[in-house]
């Protein structure tokens, strides 16, 4: 019996995503200082937070070094080799972030060497036929920005806009797709409501203020990017969750921020990882982080985003899977539902798997493994996992075989 083939639209972008702090190594920012102060504390929290099977499978969670990003994957120096692998694996695009603290380590002081570094990154991508999707804020900020109150400072949107102008002016003509903010709601919630990210505040009013300032930061950046390059495309990466039978959560988490900026976006980036259902669905497979795997949720989220009448790129989708036992099926199952949404006139134009490489998973450290490519953090050796070759076949054929 012949297999059914699901073709994706011509020109569909197939790629992977990373962020600067998670892969580059050597960053000095608010987060790098915070992780050093909290590493020992996280080892103690691990025993309370994670389940027994996770503790047994990943004993490194009890080592302070797990929580300090350090050299990470050293992508800062090895980016050309990593892009060679991406090209070899059939990718057509790559999403990465520019580290604000490298460009503006002190307020108003611009590091031209770092601008040149990112210029070389973009050139290396172009030479390999990889379309860059560039994020400008992926959770990390310079220390000076943090000392001024971070996203609670009324001037914060203007500080960010100044950085955006500097980057855009210096990299003019090299970037077609800009992502101003990555998961603004999630980061603001963790930083100012739940207190799990720096600066560890727990205040609903501070959370709402940060969200409003992030929305304003995007609006200013959107206008600046288009003043500098009229033809560029500008959007955000929004972490939407499928909420079944929880409409208030769906509105507040998925739609409220997008509604604020709906006039200032050329596309929507969707980061999809998880769902929440009431009553809770039983016996679903889980990732190493114990996140339930529910591929159909991405279909529902995409159908909901259709109302904004904007092109959509799936800017992140992946799972922690150190043994690579579920990643291939996870990817195929999500792509099946993405394809179904496309057939029902949802304008999805690209898919970026999270992630190209194993990387530093923020407050969880190094033990969760999200990469299509395994990284030995001691030797920095890269080894493509079996799922990387399956994804490569999909990328090259622009099709999914069931």
Model-identified regions with their sequence ranges:
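Non-catalytic scaffold segments within catalytic domains of secreted glycoside hydrolases
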Residues: 1-83, 87-92, 97, 101-402
């Amino acid at each position: 019996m012949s297999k059914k083939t699901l073709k994706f639209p011509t020109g569909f972008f197939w790629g992977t995503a990373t962020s600067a702090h998670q892969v580059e190594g050597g960053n000095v920012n608010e987060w790098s200082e915070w992780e050093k102060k909290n590493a020992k504390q996280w080892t103690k929290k691990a025993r309370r937070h994670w389940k027994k099977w996770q503790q047994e499978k990943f004993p490194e969670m009890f080592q302070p070094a797990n929580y300090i990003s350090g050299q990470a994957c050293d992508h800062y120096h090895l980016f050309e080799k990593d892009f060679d692998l991406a090209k070899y694996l059939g990718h057509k695009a790559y999403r990465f972030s520019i580290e604000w603290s490298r460009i503006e380590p002190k307020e108003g002081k611009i590091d031209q060497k770092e601008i040149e570094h990112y210029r070389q990154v973009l050139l290396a991508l172009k030479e390999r036929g990889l379309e860059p999707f560039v994020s400008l804020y992926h959770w990390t900020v310079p220390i000076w920005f943090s000392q001024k109150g971070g996203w609670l400072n009324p001037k914060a949107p203007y500080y960010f806009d100044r950085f955006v102008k500097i980057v855009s002016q210096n990299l003019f003509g090299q970037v077609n797709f800009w992502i101003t903010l990555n998961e603004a709601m999630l980061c603001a919630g963790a930083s100012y409501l739940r207190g799990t990210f720096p600066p560890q505040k727990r205040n609903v009013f501070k959370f709402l203020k940060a969200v409003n300032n992030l929305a304003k930061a995007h609006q200013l950046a959107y206008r600046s990017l288009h003043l500098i390059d009229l033809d560029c495309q500008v959007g955000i990466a929004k972490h939407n969750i499928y909420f079944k039978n929880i409409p208030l959560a769906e509105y507040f988490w998925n739609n409220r921020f997008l509604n604020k900026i709906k006039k200032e976006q050329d596309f929507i980036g969707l980061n999809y990882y998880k769902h929440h259902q009431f009553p809770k669905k039983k016996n679903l497979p889980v990732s190493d982080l114990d996140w339930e795997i529910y591929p159909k949720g991405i279909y529902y989220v995409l159908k909901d985003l259709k109302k904004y009448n904007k092109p959509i790129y799936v800017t992140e989708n992946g799972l922690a899977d150190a043994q690579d036992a579920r990643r291939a099926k996870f990817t195929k199952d999500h792509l099946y539902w993405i394809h179904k949404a496309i057939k029902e006139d949802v304008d999805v134009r690209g898919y970026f798997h999270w992630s190209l490489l194993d990387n530093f998973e923020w407050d969880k450290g190094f033990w969760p493994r999200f990469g299509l490519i395994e990284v030995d953090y001691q030797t920095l050796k890269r080894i493509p996992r079996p799922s990387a070759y399956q994804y490569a076949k999909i990328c090259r054929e622009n099709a999914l075989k069931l």
